[in-house]
Amino acid sequence: MATKILALLALLALFVSATNAFIIPQCSLAPSAIIPQFLRPVTSMGFEHLAVQAYKLQQALAASVLQQPINQLQQQSLAHLTIQTIATQQQQQFLPALSQLDVVNPVAYLQQQVLASNPLALANVAAYQQQQQLQQFLPALSQLAMVNPAAYLQQQQLLSSSPLVVGNAPTYLQQQLLQQIVPALTQLAVANPAAYLQQLLPFNQLTVSNSAAYLQQRQQLLNPLAVPNPLVTAFLQQQQLLPYSQFSLMNPALSWQQPIVGGAIF
């Protein structure tokens, strides 16, 4: 009896499972739109899972972190290219003068290659060009740069600030040439005035040819109506500027004695 009841229950279970079963053959001609209807709940549940959401958030954060430095590097590279373009355009403006300077003075040409680092060239082009013209007429400054770089830099600063350079460039050039002779002559004048007078003789052609006329010319220098020798006049002006020279900064007491010695000689 019990065996019959179990067999009947098994038959009922098979009947119910057979009526509710849905079989899709492998070679079925059913449209592909029906298949996602059965897969949609599974996929939606998979995307809504916390692990999947955390992974997607991590990927988004990693992408944003990696893209930010790349953008910054691109901006920096663009700014660097812009600066290089501006510097190249400024250098092209001075290329004709630099090519001539390369033939005349290669050392000065190498110094002019750093135009972008020169504040005077960027701030005032006219003053920079004037300074370059003055440097062409001052070969003594290039020699001074090799012997004493500190004094050369100080001389370059005085070029843009001296009113004599702006007003009268030839007088300034003559003054610069005389400055090479003045330190040795002033020391000689303090040590030995007689030797100082003899040292001045080679600089005056009139002294070599006619000593009497030379003495007469020295007396005429005291007369403001007389026509003086330009070289001697420039030298007298240089004697008046001695308190402002480097010699006066080193020894102020001896600097105040220089006009007295010059006045006694001339």
Swiss-Prot record:
Disulfide bonds: none annotated. The keyword Signal applies. Residues 1-21 form the signal peptide. InterPro entries: Seed_Storage_Prolamin (IPR051529), Zein (IPR002530). The keyword Ribosomal protein does not apply. One of its GO terms (molecular function) is nutrient reservoir activity. It holds the Pfam family Zein. It comes from the Eukaryota. Keywords: Seed storage protein, Signal, Storage protein. PANTHER family: ALPHA KAFIRIN (PTHR48199:SF1). Zeins are major seed storage proteins. The alpha zeins of 19 kDa and 22 kDa account for 70% of the total zein fraction. They are encoded by a large multigene family. Belongs to the zein family. This is 22 kDa alpha-zein 8. It comes from Zea mays.
